Amino acid sequence: MRYEFHWEVLWSGQSGRWLLEGLATTVELSALGWVLAAALGIVSGAMRTVPWRPLRALATVYVEFFRNVPLLVWMFFWYFGVPPLLPEAIREWLFRHGAEFWAGTFALGVYHGARMSEVIRGGIQAIPKTQFEAAVAMGLTTFQAYRLVIVPIALRLSLPPATNESLNLLKNSSVALTISVAELTFQTRQIETYTARAIEALTAGTVIYLVLSVGIATIMARVEDRFAIPGLIARGG
């Protein structure tokens, strides 16, 4: 018996609205998670290369701790484990304002921040040591040398691997469905449940993820070409 496709289920009833809401939530979740991951990655990646051992140790502990625990565990930890430890007023505020969304955002941010740290560290290690030595010789402190010279160059060198990590973050946002975040995968499952059309619903989700990923990769490829530094190639950390 041949399967009969009914693509109209994707825009009839509530399905179209669910898809758009899921797409919007995925974009918002990924964007906020990326901002947190980038900030943590830049700071901890730089800390792992500074001359001061305590800072290197602190950043290494963060990276190893968050990178080596599955993202799914962090989703559960921040959603189920942390709220009971908070004051009641804060806990009630969180659950009134989408605790599952913020738990998912934080889990994505700290997990991918640890992975982004390795990307930034690799970019810094790709910079000739003479760049740092010249900055210090001009009278800059270590902090100023990193802020004004080393980190800006490292960011440009790290664009290709950072793009890959950003795409991983986008795709990993689907894990948030396990804590009831109504992102794209959650909504495609909901459409499948209500319409009994798994192939159509999951195909729609697949195509949307593909369009998002290809779009981001295309934009970032142009950014990489624009900011490429001839003669310097980032190495993996």
Question: Where do the language-model regions lie?
Answer:
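Transmembrane alpha-helices and adjacent helix-loop boundaries
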Residues: M1-G237
